[in-house]
Amino acid sequence: MSAIPKAADTISPDEYLEGERSADVRHEYVDGRAYAMAGASDDHNRITRNILTALDNALRGKLCEPFATDMMVKIPPAFAEAFYYPDVLVACDPTDSAKYYRERPSLIFEVLSPETERTDRREKAIAYRQIPTIEAYVLIEQDHVAVTVLRRAEPGWQSELLEGSDARLKLPGIGLEIRLDRIYERTTVARGARAPA
């Protein structure tokens, strides 16, 4: 999702949240500025749906709950005044119950595109790691089968690259193990062709 400056004037977090409730286009918010988000491709939507379905099945009857694209993540204000829309998040804290955002998610998934990859890998990776409850940040390529998992480890973070249809994404904290071919099911890549630019 590309970030496009909305206005030169800064707005407060409360003004941003109020505006998002009636906006036709979603915006992410960073330090007083709202940025319009570009639409997502069909493969982006398929990957998001596949992740959400796997999470929903794995978490049925459990405390944790998955949310897709319209649930924001609030970054701790000590780091930045920011609200992001991840593609998928998992929240496990029942007291984290604001209507439009979560402050203490356990997992965050972003499907990468050429327009968003730099922001997802840098800015958002740094911001999400400031959330003490985050166990993993999962970055999913959409034009080839590859997933990068940034996991909280002592001391710091570990990065794991998964490639190929037979590779498995393992998230033991929520009891999920899924083959990458399931994540890419019905996509251009799964049909054997590279996604068009």
Model-predicted segments: where are they?
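Gly/Pro/Ser/Thr-rich low-complexity, intrinsically disordered segments predominantly at protein N-termini
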Residues: 1-197
